[in-house]
Amino acid sequence: GQIPINPETGNIVEGGIYEQTEQVMKNLEGILTEAGYTFDNVVKSTCLLSDMANFSAMNEVYGKRFSQNPPARAAFAVRTLPKEVLVEIEMIAAK
């Protein structure tokens, strides 16, 4: 999974759930692109949130990356995430 670390600085991005989710999605996009995939190839994702109250905001940012057919997804609130971030997302892609 990816947490909101800026790969250039190695630091957690500042801000709230919108900013953190945006960074996570940028990280995932970079990984997908490097492997020859796009978000259209994602078949399953799992979203981990430190607080389920952030689901709607996370979902707003997440949803911008998918066209007609979003992948299967599970979302969970967890007690803690690495480095006390607000969100972590993992994806499985296939061609």
Give residue ranges: language-model regions.
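Short, polar/acidic, helix-capping and beta-turn segments at strand->helix junctions
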Residues: 2-95
